[in-house]
Amino acid sequence: MVKFLLLALALGVSCAQHQNLEVSPSEVDGKWHSLYIAADNKSKVSEGGPLRVYVKHLECSDECQTFTIKFYTKVENVCQEHRVVGRKGKDGKYITDFSGQNYFHVVEKADDTMTFHNVNVDDSGKTNVILVVGKGESSSIEQKQRFEKTAEKYDIPKENIEHLVTTDTCNQ
């Protein structure tokens, strides 16, 4: 019986670590900036990678059943603007197409920052990506440390973390 209870507790803690946080339009709508990004497949978020995104604006509507993201990517140092609309699925994750199928949700909110977890599925397989965006264009040591802990929860090595502020030259 004790083993069963310990297993149930471990499963509950594991699920709680990957829960979807609810957001409201007042928390989301407006200008945002990408601060950090990381992925279990680092090439996807390295300079020139298809999932290295520079977020500029977020908006949710219909009680956050849809989530619109305006962002840029860079191809050969040329900024390309994109706008995607994620629709909330029954599991609470938003679904959209960009460089494959994407399933994303907010995993942390704090100090004018939000952290997203995204699962990108394309022809090469599945990639776990985490991204932290902020209302400001800089980040603190504490924010980076929180991001490192979040990366660890998703089995993304610290060395796969990319600081985006210094490489964001789009729409300035």
Curated annotation (Swiss-Prot):
It is found in: Secreted; Cytoplasm. Induction: Repressed by androgens and estrogens (at protein level). Repression by estrogens and androgens does not occur in immature 20-day old animals. Transmembrane segments: none annotated. N-glycosylated. InterPro entries: Calycin, Lipocalin, Lipocalin_CS, Lipocln_cytosolic_FA-bd_dom, OBP-like. It holds the Pfam family Lipocalin. GO terms for molecular function: odorant binding; small molecule binding. Gene3D superfamilies: 2.40.128.20. Glycans are attached at residue 41. PROSITE patterns: LIPOCALIN. The keyword Transcription does not apply. Disulfide bonds join 60-64, 79-170. Keywords: Allergen, Cytoplasm, Disulfide bond, Glycoprotein, Secreted, Signal. Belongs to the calycin superfamily. Lipocalin family. PANTHER family: LIPOCALIN (PTHR11430), ODORANT-BINDING PROTEIN 1A-RELATED (PTHR11430:SF65). This is Male-specific submandibular salivary gland protein. It comes from Mesocricetus auratus (Golden hamster). The gene is MSP.
